[in-house]
Amino acid sequence: MNEEVEDGEVKPLELSSEDKAILVETLKNKLQALAEQHVDVLESLAPSVRKRVDVLMEIQSQHDELEVKFFEEKAALEAKYQKLYGPLYSKRSKIVSGVLEVQGETEEREEKGVPDFWLNAMKNNEILAEEIHESDEEALKYLKDIKWCRIDDPKGFKFEFFFYTNPFFKNQVLTKTYHMIDEDDEPILEKAIGTEIEWHPGYCLTQEVLTKESSESTKPITKTEECESFFNFFSPPQVPDDDAKIDENTAEELQNQMERDYDIASTLRDKIIPHAVSWFTREAVQDEDYGASWVDDEEEDDNNDEYSDEEA
């Protein structure tokens, strides 16, 4: 697959019109089916009920107009507070890395900062824990800080992963950028771009070398294969080149991969970065478990109520 590399970033292929149409065919079919169901429902109503539903739809339109303003004001408010968070994140980074000493520390200390802070914070989150493999952990111990910011042209957001000098790769900063488009007043992922990691020889974590013994007279056969790694996050799912045919199953698989990738990004942006110390101490894990338990209890109560009604 051909890719363009510029400024250390791998740019995804531009899709032909045919590929784009095939890739979104499944979604279009679903939307078409929903539209047909909408018409069927309206046509099945009695005239008097249909008039009432028409008024309800007008009310919904007014609600949707207000919702657009809500999202606009929400974006402005988020931008305001993101700037206010900045100094706090900076101080946190200095303490974690050992640049800033905390008052009241004893002079006798074996190591600076908070070792493995980001590694443990991410491992304590269920979604990210699935992405971090044992082979990744040593490299992630060199992770110094994670930042994110919104971008306007094109619209989206960007991650920066800052690393200490390490034996695994040359990059000091790994980035991941998400380009979004507005569709029906809701941001939709268009594409993601990740840094090309410059691995040191023999330290690549996204590939493994397999060796197969051959006859005594010849050398062993070796081949390189892709393997699971957290660092695949910086190589987002790509669509095959224009010559390849994308069937419905492939399109659905790509969609699932992109959704998974975006889930990881959302977790980093909305949970890990703003509440890193709570994930490090596992306080956030307890909060999530409590929330899930509360929902389960509510569902159980609802089920019990249903059984009681049936018995009555």
Curated annotation (Swiss-Prot):
Principal subcellular localization: nucleus
Sequence similarity: Belongs to the nucleosome assembly protein (NAP) family.
Keywords attached to this entry: Chaperone, Coiled coil, Cytoplasm, Nucleus
A Pfam family annotated for this UniProt entry: NAP
Coiled-coil stretches noted in the UniProt entry, renumbered to this chain: 24-78
Motif (Nuclear export signal): 45-60
Notes concerning its domains: The acidic domain is probably involved in the interaction with histones.
Record-linked InterPro entries: NAP-like_sf, NAP_family
Localization in the cell: Nucleus; Cytoplasm
PANTHER family: TESTIS-SPECIFIC Y-ENCODED PROTEIN
Superkingdom of origin: Eukaryota
Its job: May modulate chromatin structure by regulation of nucleosome assembly/disassembly.
Name of the featured protein: Nucleosome assembly protein 1-like 4
Molecular functions per Gene Ontology: chromatin binding; histone binding
Any single biological process term in GO: double-strand break repair via homologous recombination
Cellular component annotations (GO), alphabetically ordered: chromatin; cytoplasm; nucleus
Location of region: Disordered: 289-312
